[in-house]
Amino acid sequence: MIPPRFEYHAPKSVGEAVALLGQLGSDAKLLAGGHSLLPMMKLRFAQPEHLIDINRIPELRGIREEGSTVVIGAMTVENDLISSPIVQARLPLLAEAAKLIADPQVRNRGTIGGDIAHGHPGNDHPALSIAVEAHFVLEGPNGRRTVPADGFFLGTYMTLLEENEVMVEIRVPAFAQGTGWAYEKLKRKTGDWATAGCAVVMRKSGNTVSHIRIALTNVAPTALRREGGRSRLLGKAFTKEAVQAAADAAIAICEPAEDLRGDADYKTAMAGQMVKRALNAAWARCA
């Protein structure tokens, strides 16, 4: 289908984009990579009268280090995450997980900020950002504010990002030495959303788990942080029984929507399997 008619705007700065959002209000949508918005427009699920293309704003791109924090511009594309020496060295989970997102063509256009701001539970970066304890810098008419990933996602297509705000950057603490990490994603084919997915970041002290973050993809209206799974592992020995207990805790909070990828029972069971796989893979990487 052909999208409805719209007016096109191409601001050159974040301030200009924010001003346009304030002027045009709910009739406007930001255009990043376009892989989520444009299909919705073709199906008439979204019918904005104005598109604000933020691809020409240089400050929204790039990856840099600020002390122990990695700063990623919201318009940074997936392939830049994969190829970045900074991300490979300091946040290898993001570099590896980006390879599992969609296909090469999409990874050349799709942006990390767009994936997050869209608020779809099947997108990969919401769970990843929760697992790595990311914070999002948002700019609106009253200046900038920083919000944690944990709590940013309110429901399907619903986030804390206001309609007059632009996501500027993602700030992530670099992994400490010895950190283990993994992202396990079950999908039907290359390019598909996850049937179920799990991101894990952990550290150990001897045979004891000293730090653990678990987040789930596409098994609820939002990405989920698994606090119950964390409590079953933190400060405890890493055993088969502890891993199973964490998986059981994840299963208990799943509320997946039924679709062509499977019914609720199947997706819930697969979430438990992804948790176990991710925990074991992350533990094996702990130094």
UniProtKB/Swiss-Prot annotation:
Gene Ontology MF terms in the entry: anaerobic carbon-monoxide dehydrogenase activity; carbon-monoxide oxygenase activity; FAD binding
UniProt name for this protein: Carbon monoxide dehydrogenase medium chain
Gene name tied to this protein: cutM
EC number in record: 1.2.5.3
Enzyme class (EC, first level): oxidoreductase
Known role: Catalyzes the oxidation of carbon monoxide to carbon dioxide.
Amino acids binding FAD: 32-36, 111-115
Annotated catalysed reactions: CO + a quinone + H2O = a quinol + CO2
Residues of the FAD-binding PCMH-type domain: 1-177
Cofactor comment: Binds 1 FAD per subunit.
SMART domains named among the record's database cross-references: CO_deh_flav_C
Cofactor(s) named in the record: FAD
UniProt entry keywords in alphabetical sequence: FAD, Flavoprotein, Oxidoreductase
Pfam families the record matches: CO_deh_flav_C (PF03450), FAD_binding_5 (PF00941)
